[in-house]
Regions:
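Hydrophobic, well-structured mid-protein blocks that either form specific transmembrane helices
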Residues: 1-26
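Histidine-acidic metal/acid-base catalytic patches
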Residues: 17-39, 43-129
Length: 129
C-alpha cells in the first residue's frame, strides 16, 4: 500500500528556463520514486519536442502515457491520423516500460464512437488487441 504521484504535462512545460525545458527541471529535482512522468505525448509534440526522445530519456519512469493526436497545430485527431507519429511512438512507449495507455480526444469532426473505433483500430493494427 502506497501512494505514487504522477505529473501530466501540457505544452507549456516544454518552455525553457535557463536553456532547459521546465519538465526536465521538475523531473530532475524530484526523485523517480516520488514522482513518475505521465507524459501526454501529443502535448510533448505540440510543445516542440519529440515524444520518442522523451520516452527514451525517462525510460522506467513513465508507467502511464496519454496518446493524443493533433493535426494543424492544436486540432484533435484520431490516433495515427495526426502529426505526432504514433507508429514510431508506440514501440518506444512499450520499450520505456509504459503499462497503461490512455487515449484522449476532446474534439471530434465525426461522432465520438466513430473516432474511438478509428483509434482502436490503430492498436489492433499494431497487435495490441
Amino acid at each position: 500500500a502506497g501512494l505514487k504521484y504522477g505529473y501530466h504535462n501540457h505544452d507549456f512545460e516544454f518552455r525553457t528556463v535557463g536553456g532547459k525545458p521546465i519538465i526536465d527541471r521538475l523531473l530532475e529535482r524530484i526523485p523517480a520514486e516520488r514522482l513518475v512522468a505521465q507524459f501526454d505525448l501529443g502535448w510533448v509534440h505540440v510543445g516542440g519536442q519529440r515524444p520518442v526522445e522523451y520516452l527514451r530519456r525517462y525510460k522506467g519512469r513513465v508507467p502511464i502515457v496519454h496518446f493524443k493526436d493533433f493535426v494543424q497545430g492544436r486540432e484533435d485527431a484520431e490516433i495515427g491520423r495526426g502529426a505526432v507519429g504514433y507508429d514510431a511512438v508506440l514501440p518506444a512507449a512499450l520499450d520505456a516500460g509504459v503499462e497503461i495507455i490512455i487515449v484522449e480526444q476532446e474534439r471530434f469532426d465525426k461522432s465520438p464512437f466513430e473516432s474511438a473505433a478509428i483509434s482502436l483500430e490503430f492498436f489492433r493494427k499494431h497487435g495490441l488487441l
